[in-house]
From Swiss-Prot:
It comes from Clostridium acetobutylicum (strain ATCC 824 / DSM 792 / JCM 1419 / IAM 19013 / LMG 5710 / NBRC 13948 / NRRL B-527 / VKM B-1787 / 2291 / W). It is found in: Cytoplasm. The keyword Amino-acid biosynthesis applies. Signal peptide: none annotated. Its main location: cytoplasm. Belongs to the ArgR family. One of its GO terms (cellular component) is cytoplasm. PANTHER family: ARGININE REPRESSOR (PTHR34471:SF1). Regulates arginine biosynthesis genes. Pathway: Amino-acid biosynthesis; L-arginine biosynthesis [regulation]. SUPFAM superfamilies: C-terminal domain of arginine repressor, Winged helix' DNA-binding domain. It comes from the Bacteria. This is Arginine repressor. Keywords: Amino-acid biosynthesis, Arginine biosynthesis, Cytoplasm, DNA-binding, Repressor, Transcription, Transcription regulation.
């Protein structure tokens, strides 16, 4: 079911300019698939869909290009090789890297499109990530630690 839904989503966004999850859910329903907004939201994450500016000047869902996917994988590798420690203080995540690597590691974090990140800033060897809640910060730390096998 999920595979056929994912296939249909990719077909829909390639044929039409879909701007919202609600529009996508409606298109799926028109094709005979019963979906909720939560399901569509998960599908968008799993398919790693992004929003791009359409020729009409509005944002629409699109697939990530192979080049961007390749770059994202490279950044994750760089992250795993340069991060020394990931810690949390309240709703702030602190990532320590080897000297000169914080910007590349921060770019890797950005490429993950993690939910709940309000913003981040990178220095030479430290990244501060402001999350929207302590629970979100905890989840971010867990995900980042998995990436460095900690």
């Amino acid at each position: 079911m999920k595979v056929s839904r994912h296939t249909k989503i990719l077909e829909i966004i390639n044929l039409k300019d879909i701007e919202t999850q609600e529009e996508l859910a409606e298109e799926l329903r028109r094709s005979g698939m019963e979906v909720t907004q939560a399901t569509v939201s998960r599908d968008i994450k799993e398919l790693k869909l992004i929003k791009v500016l359409s020729s009409k000047g509005r944002y629409k869902y699109a697939t990530i290009s192979p080049t961007e996917s390749f770059l994202s994988n490279k950044l994750v590798t760089i992250f795993a090789q340069t991060v020394l420690n990931v810690d949390r203080v309240n709703n702030m995540v602190v990532v320590k890297t080897i000297s000169g690597s914080a910007n590349a590691a921060a770019e890797a974090i950005d490429s993950l499109n993690l939910d709940g990140i309000a913003g981040s800033i990178a220095g030479d060897n430290t990244i501060f990530i402001l999350s929207r809640s302590e629970e979100t910060a905890f989840n971010i730390v867990q995900k980042l630690k998995k990436m460095i096998n900690e």
